[in-house]
């Protein structure tokens, strides 16, 4: 089933993209609007999260189909613990259901799972599901499906700076020896590369403490569409918009 859909999506998506223009290597998405989607339909917020999980599967398929290397999804921030307990409990159960149902298909399509964030603070059942998904797909060499789970950009930078300084001190060096490259080596996203394109759904125009270091030169794409309604056409439009931009990285 997954292979059939994968091939269909690949044919449709690739036929719409400019062959002579690059696609983003790394796409990051702030998946926003689950609660508002549910409210519009007089449903509980968790219904929006449930629907959003299905969209994650579809968008993963789209990204894989067009040859994106890394797809990073902002799943749960360090600030999200402030939400109502019943909502947080549901969100912590979602990875278990998601990975149980989707990992076999990911393996079939050579997709590797990665999770960045403060995993040690996750509930035990969530941690087990995460670690199993990572282990089960460790041999895969295609798309990296990277989840930011219990993640905060500011905390990540502080943690990376502390680890970098420990390394320098152990080598008899000082803060004067700290470089961007060394700090980058200690970020949770090390080895994945910086996002080329950031997509945020639901019309909000902010980063919400997401990958603050890594997004320095990323292209941003904002859409009014709530995450549960985010379609193949929405994804394709974001990629086409990226293809039509000129990235200068501070130059001319």
Swiss-Prot record:
Database matches in SUPFAM superfamilies: Undecaprenyl diphosphate synthase
GO-annotated biological processes: polyprenol biosynthetic process
Metal-binding keyword on record: yes
CDD domains per the UniProt record, alphabetical: Cis_IPPS
GO cellular component, one term: cytosol
EC numbers on record: 2.5.1.-
Active site location: 32, 80 (proton acceptor)
InterPro entries in alphabetical order: UPP_synth-like (IPR001441), UPP_synth-like_CS (IPR018520), UPP_synth-like_sf (IPR036424)
Keywords: Magnesium, Metal-binding, Transferase
Pfam families to which the protein is assigned, alphabetical: Prenyltransf (PF01255)
One Gene Ontology molecular-function label: magnesium ion binding
Positions annotated to bind substrate: 33-37, 45, 49, 77-79, 81, 83, 200, 206-208
Residues where Mg(2+) binds: 32, 219
Needed cofactors: Mg(2+)
Keyword Glycoprotein recorded: no
HAMAP family per the UniProt record, alphabetical: ISPT
Protein role: Catalyzes the condensation of isopentenyl diphosphate (IPP) with allylic pyrophosphates generating different type of terpenoids.
NCBIfam families named among the record's database cross-references: PRK14830.1, uppS
Record's protein name: Isoprenyl transferase
